[in-house]
Regions:
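Charged phosphate-binding loop/patch that engages nucleotide di/tri-phosphates or the phosphate backbone
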Residues: 96-129
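Acidic, metal-binding active-site segment of PIN/NYN-like and related structure-specific nucleases
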Residues: 44-62
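Mid-chain, well-packed structural core segment of small domains
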Residues: 59-94
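N-terminal beta1-alpha1 ligand-phosphate binding loop
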Residues: 2-12
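Short helix-loop-beta junction
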Residues: 16-24
C-alpha cells in the first residue's frame, strides 16, 4: 500500500512501513512539515496514499468534505507513541482493513481496538447510524 505519514508521527513510521514492503513517505520528505491538513489530503489523494496520523482533525475534515479519498489511519491513544509500536499495529491491521482502505475508509487504531468506517461520511449516514 501507499502511505503518507503526517507530521505528528515520526519519520521512523515511514521507514518501518517501507521495510515491510510498502511505499511510505513522511510529510517531511516532501517539505510539508508546516502544511495544512487540506494540503496533506490533496497530496495523498493525488498519489493514492493513505494518510497515517494522530491528528483527529482528519476525521472532521473527512466528514465535512464527504469524499471517499484519501483514506485515513488514525492513532487515538497516547500510549502508542513509539514508531515501532505504530508500525506493528498498522501491519497487524492491514489484513482486515486493506480492502476498505483501497475503497475509501477511516481506520482508528488503538492498542486493543480497531474501528473502521467506510467513506464518504455523509449527513444521511450520520443520521441513520
Amino acid at each position: 500500500m501507499n502511505f503518507l505519514i503526517d507530521n505528528p508521527l515520526s519519520p521512523r513510521v515511514a521507514i518501518g512501513l517501507r521495510a515491510a514492503g510498502h511505499d511510505a513517505v513522511h510529510v517531511l520528505d516532501y517539505g510539508m512539515h508546516a502544511a495544512t491538513d487540506e494540503a496533506i489530503f490533496g497530496r495523498a489523494a493525488l498519489e493514492s496514499r493513505v494518510v497515517v496520523s494522530a491528528d483527529t482533525d482528519f476525521g472532521t475534515l473527512l466528514a465535512l468534505r464527504e469524499v471517499a479519498s484519501p483514506s485515513v489511519i488514525l492513532f487515538r491513544t497516547a500510549s502508542l507513541r513509539r514508531a515501532d509500536d505504530q508500525v506493528a499495529l498498522i501491519l497487524a491491521a492491514l489484513p482486515s482493513t486493506e480492502a476498505a482502505l483501497r475503497r475509501g475508509a477511516i481506520v482508528v487504531l488503538e492498542r486493543h481496538r480497531l474501528r473502521l468506517r467506510d467513506l464518504p461520511i455523509t449527513r444521511q449516514r450520520e443520521e441513520n447510524g
